C-alpha cells in the first residue's frame, strides 16, 4: 500500500490539484465552509480552545480557519537569551550537522544545501559545516511560522518545483524531496550569523505567504526568482524573536539552516519525531 501511495504521487497532476484545492479553500461558501471546518476539526482532533476564534462559524473560508491565530500567550517564548526557539508547531523530521554540503533527509536519502537553496552558491557557502533542522507541520497543527531569533531579512528566493506530499512516508521514499518541491527561501542576518528559513510547498498547499511580501506567486515556469533587501536604514525588515514571518495555506515543512558554530547544541528532547511547540527552547546558541 505504501508503494502504491508513493507511485500515485509521481503520476497525479499535483500542481493542477493544488490550484483547485487552493480555490476551494479560499471560497466563502457559508454553511458549506462551516461544515467542512467542523469535519476537519473532528477528523484531526484539533484543540480549538487554543484558537483566538474557537467557533467554526467565525471563519469565512477554510483558509482563514487553517491559518487561524492562537490566543495571546498560549505559546509563551522561552525567556533564556542563550536559546533560540522553535518556529512552529509540528514534529522534528531530522536535525543535525550539514556534512560536506549534504543534509540528511531519511535513511538512505540526503540532498545538497546548494540544491535546497535554489543553486545559490554564495548562499550555500555561508552554511558549510553548519547545522540544519527539518520540521513537518501536520494538518492538525497551527500553521503560522515564527522567528527562532531576531533577524534582518537580506534575501528571498523562490524556487519552482514539484509538489510531492512531505509527510514522513514520502520523506522516507522520495529522493531529495525538500530540494525538489516548490519552496521559498528567506535568509536573515542574526547575532549568530546567517540563518535560512526554507518554506517547502507540498501537494494541495495552496500558497506560501511571508509577512513582508504576502503570497509569493511568481509567474509559472522553471525560473528561480531572487529579491535582495537592505539590512540597514528605514527600509530594513527586522523581525523579533517569536514574531510571525510567514504562514502555509494547507501546511508543509520548514527547513532551517545555521552557520558553522552558530549552535552549541540542540535543546534536550529535540530529535527526530519529537513534537515541537512554537516558542519552546530549540537550540543553545554558541
Curated annotation (Swiss-Prot):
Write out the annotated subcellular location: Cell membrane
- Reaction equations catalysed: a 1,2-diacyl-sn-glycero-3-phospho-L-serine + H(+) = a 1,2-diacyl-sn-glycero-3-phosphoethanolamine + CO2
Q: In which pathway does it act?
A: Phospholipid metabolism; phosphatidylethanolamine biosynthesis; phosphatidylethanolamine from CDP-diacylglycerol: step 2/2
Q: Which cofactors does the annotated protein need, by name?
A: pyruvate
Sorted alphabetically, which keywords does the UniProt record give?
Cell membrane, Decarboxylase, Lipid biosynthesis, Lipid metabolism, Lyase, Membrane, Phospholipid biosynthesis, Phospholipid metabolism, Pyruvate, Zymogen
Q: Lyase: is it a keyword of this entry? A: yes
**Record-level Gene Ontology MF annotations:** phosphatidylserine decarboxylase activity
Q: Which residues carry this modification: Pyruvic acid (Ser)?
A: 252
Please give, as recorded in its UniProt entry, the membrane topology of this protein. Answer: Peripheral membrane protein
Q: InterPro entries, per this entry?
A: PS_Dcarbxylase, PSD-B, PSD_type1_pro
Q: Where is this site: Cleavage (non-hydrolytic)?
A: 251-252
The record's free-text note on cofactor binding: Binds 1 pyruvoyl group covalently per subunit.
Name a GO CC annotation attached to this entry: plasma membrane
Report what the Swiss-Prot or TrEMBL entry states about this protein's PTMs. Answer: Is synthesized initially as an inactive proenzyme. Formation of the active enzyme involves a self-maturation process in which the active site pyruvoyl group is generated from an internal serine residue via an autocatalytic post-translational modification. Two non-identical subunits are generated from the proenzyme in this reaction, and the pyruvate is formed at the N-terminus of the alpha chain, which is derived from the carboxyl end of the proenzyme.
Q: Name one Pfam family in it.
A: PS_Dcarbxylase
One of the GO BP terms on file: phosphatidylethanolamine biosynthetic process
The record's EC number reads: 4.1.1.65
What's the superkingdom here? Bacteria
HAMAP family hit by this protein: PS_decarb_PSD_B_type1
- Subunit structure comment from the entry: Heterodimer of a large membrane-associated beta subunit and a small pyruvoyl-containing alpha subunit.
The entry's family comment says: Belongs to the phosphatidylserine decarboxylase family. PSD-B subfamily. Prokaryotic type I sub-subfamily.
Q: What job does the chain carry out?
A: Catalyzes the formation of phosphatidylethanolamine (PtdEtn) from phosphatidylserine (PtdSer).
PANTHER family, per the entry: PHOSPHATIDYLSERINE DECARBOXYLASE (PTHR10067), PHOSPHATIDYLSERINE DECARBOXYLASE PROENZYME, MITOCHONDRIAL (PTHR10067:SF6)
> How is this protein named in the record?
Phosphatidylserine decarboxylase proenzyme
Amino acid at each position: 500500500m505504501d508503494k502504491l501511495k508513493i507511485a500515485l504521487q509521481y503520476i497525479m497532476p499535483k500542481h493542477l490539484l493544488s490550484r483547485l484545492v487552493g480555490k476551494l479553500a479560499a471560497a466563502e461558501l457559508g454553511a458549506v465552509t462551516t461544515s467542512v471546518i467542523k469535519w476537519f476539526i473532528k477528523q484531526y482532533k484539533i484543540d480549538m480552545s487554543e484558537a483566538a476564534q474557537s467557533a467554526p462559524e467565525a471563519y469565512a473560508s477554510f483558509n482563514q480557519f487553517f491559518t487561524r491565530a492562537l490566543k495571546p500567550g498560549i505559546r509563551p517564548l522561552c525567556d533564556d537569551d542563550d536559546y533560540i526557539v522553535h518556529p512552529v508547531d509540528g514534529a522534528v523530521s531530522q536535525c543535525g550537522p550539514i556534512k560536506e554540503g549534504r543534509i540528511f533527509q531519511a535513511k538512505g536519502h540526503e540532498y545538497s544545501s546548494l540544491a535546497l537553496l535554489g543553486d545559490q552558491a554564495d548562499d550555500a557557502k555561508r552554511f558549510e559545516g553548519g547545522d540544519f533542522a527539518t520540521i513537518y507541520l501536520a494538518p492538525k497543527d497551527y500553521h503560522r511560522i515564527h522567528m527562532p531569533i531576531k533577524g534582518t531579512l537580506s534575501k528571498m528566493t523562490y524556487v519552482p518545483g514539484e509538489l510531492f506530499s512531505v509527510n514522513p512516508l514520502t520523506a522516507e521514499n522520495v529522493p531529495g524531496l525538500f530540494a525538489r518541491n516548490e519552496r521559498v527561501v528567506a535568509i536573515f542576518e542574526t547575532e549568530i550569523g546567517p540563518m535560512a528559513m526554507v518554506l517547502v510547498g507540498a501537494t494541495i498547499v495552496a500558497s506560501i505567504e511571508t509577512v513582508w511580501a504576502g503570497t509569493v506567486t511568481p509567474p509559472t515556469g522553471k525560473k528561480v526568482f531572487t529579491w535582495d533587501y537592505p539590512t540597514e536604514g528605514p527600509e530594513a525588515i527586522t523581525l523579533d524573536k517569536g514574531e510571525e514571518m510567514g504562514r502555509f495555506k494547507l501546511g508543509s515543512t520548514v527547513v532551517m539552516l545555521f552557520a558553522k558554530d552558530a549552535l552549541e547544541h540542540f535543546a534536550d528532547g529535540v530529535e527526530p519525531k519529537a513534537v515541537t511547540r512554537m516558542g519552546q527552547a530549540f537550540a543553545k546558541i554558541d
